[in-house]
A protein has these predicted regions:
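Core catalytic lobe of class I
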Residues: 1-3, 7-223
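Cysteine-dependent PTP/DSP-like catalytic domain, specifically the C-terminal lobe
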Residues: 218-234
């Protein structure tokens, strides 16, 4: 039987699924309960404080400045919980890149910046059609020599609600996340997402035969993730 790290999280709401656990709580609190060197891959999409934020509200540069201690602590936790060969995929947009990159590189070491051409963008001005992914490859990591840029550029938007609207304002396609974790890990590996959103990473893990730990602070998106997983396991 596949096993994933046990956590003492009696103060947090959580749901157990055959392949992993979804937590409703602050990721910085939850991740500190995970064992060292227990995670095979991190794929996460943090709040976009410049422009669209994690909860769909407009943010500004000052929001990122006050979050520096939070991300320094989080990246140090990434380093602690990851296995030596683990890969990390950390999404950001062009406005947040200058903030995230120095911290990410200092603590984790950035080995590459991937570009996802999403072929569409919001608003009435020149469209933002690209998003960036800070990539860390652990010692001995092997992603199989795949052509990531050409393979992901045509991936389109993710899950929709029953009325056709996206279930999360900044969600990523399941196929995109699935490609990343399949490039970086073998079946049965443990995937961590500290900003779970509407559950794309969880669904990608299920479809690729990986285990998962998902953390989401927003109660509404937590329940959305659980519902999507219920549908996956039917």
């Amino acid at each position: 039987m596949l096993r994933y790290p046990s956590c003492n999280l009696s103060t947090y709401d959580r749901r157990e699924f055959p392949g992993g656990t979804v937590y409703n709580g602050d990721c910085l609190d939850v991740i500190k309960t995970l064992p060292e060197s227990s995670v095979d891959c991190i794929a996460t999409d943090p709040p976009y404080f410049l422009g669209m934020t994690h909860n769909g509200q407009k943010g500004n540069f000052r929001d990122l400045s006050i979050c520096r201690p939070f991300y320094r602590d989080l990246f140090n936790e990434f380093r602690r919980v990851c296995r030596p060969e683990a890969c990390i995929y950390f999404f950001c947009d062009w406005r947040g890149y200058a903030f995230y990159y120095p911290l990410f590189d200092e603590i984790l070491k950035a080995h590459n910046m991937l570009v996802w051409n999403k072929l569409s963008g919001p608003g009435n001005h020149y469209a933002f059609i690209h998003e960036l992914v800070l990539f860390h490859a652990g010692k001995g990591a092997n992603i199989g020599g795949t052509s990531i840029i050409s393979d992901i550029r045509a991936f389109t938007s993710g899950a929709k609600s029953t009325d056709g609207d996206k279930v999360h304002p900044t969600q990523k396609p399941v196929a995109l996340i699935q490609k990343f974790i399949e490039d970086a890990t073998a079946p049965g590996a443990l995937i961590l997402d500290t900003f779970g959103g509407s559950g794309a990473t969880a669904v990608a893990a299920v479809r690729s035969g990986r285990r998962f730990i998902i953390m989401e602070q927003d109660e509404g998106y937590y329940h959305t993730t659980c519902k999507r997983l219920e549908n996956e396991y039917r």
